[in-house]
């Protein structure tokens, strides 16, 4: 797994300049946005220049070894490049679970905050005692927390819960983030309305397990996701709601009904399946079987033919045989999944799977990863060919990272950052980013579609 760094900045002139680097997932990004909001509200200014900053905050990712390596690489860079008087504040998942890996760098770190301990960022910066360790406490418990969005102004992530009650054998997230802690419905709605008021047009709901939302709050331990979605959809406006991290056992008829009835709840679901073989799923401690997965996918495709399904799969889990891997290849080859993230199993200390026998050699895992990736690439190429000549409604995100002569756009089946996009090479009609346009698909490059703007969507 690779992490995506996010830098936060604007023009800074004071002596209280801060420089943020946020690594990892969108959930980490939300924490960084809250910390940034707290500091800006307190009078600090953000700078894009590392050497200019008085305080450097690194929000680490500790999910996989590759992510931890990236975190320590960034930490070393900060130590090497910062000005002599600058202070380093370290936070995030790696701090909570893998502090021993940080030992060589800790003498250079001035403050350490636990994962999710974002509301104490101001206390950390203003503390007189270098190296103070602040208690871990999620900002979800706070009623009023400022936030500075780092995403383009037209979309934002809304984290509705923290932690996870599931205990998948390969995962250490519960030991990092703790158990499920849901925001109260009133707080979620307050944040939702605020984002709409700020002009956000696409709100992406996230949690470790979105479908578990509210099970820690309700007396019957049932999910409250349907209730919060229903409340959100009562708000007027032509906005999009996108759901990420929705486990297969939590997708029920009530959610499907909502997607059918209100187009603002996008016909897009991110369902981490991890595998399709029953024996492997059982060893992973997953709660769904092959039969249940296929029943769910069939229902989704039948009820909502235009739905887009994103998922993640793991190859090389301990004991995975060639036959079981081939079953996974066949499943992917059937084209059930539109957007797919494929990961090679990582032996994470503290996970149940790390102690399992029959660990798969890295060479075998790499080979299986390549085979499965090639299988999905064929699906994508076939799918993209069928798109050529069609006109889709898409939002213009901004300039393409490789060229300001190109723009990037997304239709409802593409989530930002994790999915492919539309490369727009004819955009004379575009008057602003964050607006929706009709785009004719003229071709494709790899996983991305290519298109030209035909017209602006009426009402935009």
From Swiss-Prot:
Cofactor notes: Binds 2 [4Fe-4S] clusters. One cluster is coordinated with 3 cysteines and an exchangeable S-adenosyl-L-methionine.
Q: What is its main location?
A: cytoplasm
Q: Where is the Radical SAM core domain?
A: 150-382
- Give the GO biological process terms: tRNA modification
Q: Which reaction does it catalyse?
A: L-aspartate(89)-[ribosomal protein uS12]-hydrogen + (sulfur carrier)-SH + AH2 + 2 S-adenosyl-L-methionine = 3-methylsulfanyl-L-aspartate(89)-[ribosomal protein uS12]-hydrogen + (sulfur carrier)-H + 5'-deoxyadenosine + L-methionine + A + S-adenosyl-L-homocysteine + 2 H(+)
- Gene3D superfamilies reported in the protein's UniProt record: Methylthiotransferase, N-terminal domain, Nucleic acid-binding proteins, tm_1862 like domain
Q: Name one GO cellular component term.
A: cytosol
Question: Which sites bind [4Fe-4S] cluster 1?
Answer: 25, 61, 93
PROSITE patterns attached to this UniProt entry: MTTASE_N (PS51449), MTTASE_RADICAL (PS01278), RADICAL_SAM (PS51918)
Q: GO molecular-function annotation terms?
A: 4 iron, 4 sulfur cluster binding; aspartic acid methylthiotransferase activity; metal ion binding; protein methylthiotransferase activity
Localization in the cell: Cytoplasm
Cofactor(s) recorded in Swiss-Prot or TrEMBL: [4Fe-4S] cluster
SUPFAM superfamilies in the record, alphabetically?
Answer: Radical SAM enzymes
Q: Where is the TRAM domain?
A: 385-455
What residues bind [4Fe-4S] cluster 2, as annotated? Answer: 164, 168, 171
Q: Where's the MTTase N-terminal domain?
A: 16-130
Q: InterPro entries, alphabetically?
A: Elp3/MiaA/NifB-like_rSAM, Methylthiotransferase, Methylthiotransferase_CS, Methylthiotransferase_N, Methylthiotransferase_N_sf, NA-bd_OB-fold, Ribosomal_uS12_MeSTrfase_RimO, rSAM
Q: Which domain of life is it from?
A: Bacteria
Q: Which Pfam families match?
A: Radical_SAM, TRAM_2, UPF0004
Task: Give the EC number.
Answer: 2.8.4.4
Q: Which HAMAP family match?
A: MTTase_RimO
What family does this belong to? Belongs to the methylthiotransferase family. RimO subfamily.
Functional note: Catalyzes the methylthiolation of an aspartic acid residue of ribosomal protein uS12.
Q: What is this protein called?
A: Ribosomal protein uS12 methylthiotransferase RimO
> What is the species listed in this Swiss-Prot or TrEMBL entry?
Chlamydia abortus (strain DSM 27085 / S26/3) (Chlamydophila abortus)
